[in-house]
Amino acid sequence: MAQSTLYSRVLGTGSYLPPDRVTNQQLADRLAKEGIETSDEWIVARTGIHARHFAAPDVTTSDLAYQAARRAIEAADIDPQSIDLIIVATSTPDFVFPSTACLLQNKLGIKSGGAAFDVQAVCSGFAYAMAMADSFIRGGQHRTALVVGAETFSRILDFKDRTTCVLFGDGAGAVILSASEEPGVLGSALHADGSYSNILCTPGNVNRGVIEGSAFLHMDGQAVFKLAVNVLEKVAVEALAKANLAPEQIDWLIPHQANIRIMTSTCRKLGLPQERMVVTVDQHGNTSAASIPMALDVAVRDGRIQRGQHVLIEGVGGGFTWGASVFRF
């Protein structure tokens, strides 16, 4: 008797935003005290961002991940002990080690002894993590995965640099992927090019108790924009080809919520109407690895994304990294 093909499919989604919502005007007022000029109009015109959320000083990335994970577990209606794989995509972990995934496993009280580890691909992190979880499930090594994107980017922002500090926010999003005989994740594509590592980075490290280099985020905005609009369309088309789907068969596009201009450019190149693109960057800002799962959860909970629909996610981030996945929800 032939063995049935295993797939991974999304059982549930969850997200969490810290309660401190900071509007552009509030941020501009804060920066003005440091002699830094910006405005709501300036930020909106260049990014599409109106507000973002910042975590309180005593709140960690694993705290945000825990809240999102609980909601995803509840939505999936599963026993947390059935989770045998946890992957957390983050560039702002609680510690150098142990991993945020191990800390999250403990906070959730999961005693299954399954694998738990972090993925660091910055804003592409969730696309990387989801593709990895899908591969583990298809290969039979694991059956139920908790995949999380969580960030506290406010901790690495230089609030004297108005070109970066207005862009980012904190938050977490999560999905439960489970083994299924019904197709879920249909195709993924991941890429990186380390020769562009200097255009988006936090070039610091800990050496003998001292931070060497810079602990703040650095970005060459123009270089990132040019590279992003070039690679995102290509990786989306590649993932679609692996899924044997044409762009017009996609019901929803969920791009990394970096900048509305990058997002609309990719949507247009794929020939998709803007109405099929999920947008949360206006209220969340750029939450790096958390942005895609947070946007997914928003669109699932407000009823836009329905079971059986095809969803394309794509992201690009520091490294330079980029990736995409297509799944049937």
Curated annotation (Swiss-Prot):
Enzyme Commission code: 2.3.1.180
Pfam families named in the record: ACP_syn_III (PF08545), ACP_syn_III_C (PF08541)
SUPFAM superfamilies: Thiolase-like
Residue ranges of the TM segments: none
Name of the top EC class for this enzyme: transferase
Subcellular location: Cytoplasm
Keyword Lipid biosynthesis belongs to the record: yes
Keyword Methyltransferase on entry: no
GO biological process, one term: fatty acid biosynthetic process
Keywords linked to the UniProt accession: Acyltransferase, Cytoplasm, Fatty acid biosynthesis, Fatty acid metabolism, Lipid biosynthesis, Lipid metabolism, Multifunctional enzyme, Transferase
Region spans: ACP-binding: 257-261
Pathway: Lipid metabolism; fatty acid biosynthesis
Annotated catalytic residues: C123, H256, N286
InterPro entries to which the protein is assigned, alphabetical: ACP_syn_III_C, ACP_syn_III_N, FabH, Thiolase-like
Catalytic activity: malonyl-[ACP] + acetyl-CoA + H(+) = 3-oxobutanoyl-[ACP] + CO2 + CoA
GO cellular component: cytoplasm
GO molecular function: 3-oxoacyl-[acyl-carrier-protein] synthase activity; beta-ketoacyl-acyl-carrier-protein synthase III activity
UniProt similarity note: Belongs to the thiolase-like superfamily. FabH family.
Record note on quaternary structure: Homodimer.
Domain note: The last Arg residue of the ACP-binding site is essential for the weak association between ACP/AcpP and FabH.
Function: Catalyzes the condensation reaction of fatty acid synthesis by the addition to an acyl acceptor of two carbons from malonyl-ACP. Catalyzes the first condensation reaction which initiates fatty acid synthesis and may therefore play a role in governing the total rate of fatty acid production. Possesses both acetoacetyl-ACP synthase and acetyl transacylase activities. Its substrate specificity determines the biosynthesis of branched-chain and/or straight-chain of fatty acids.
Protein name: Beta-ketoacyl-[acyl-carrier-protein] synthase III
Native source species: Burkholderia vietnamiensis (strain G4 / LMG 22486) (Burkholderia cepacia (strain R1808))
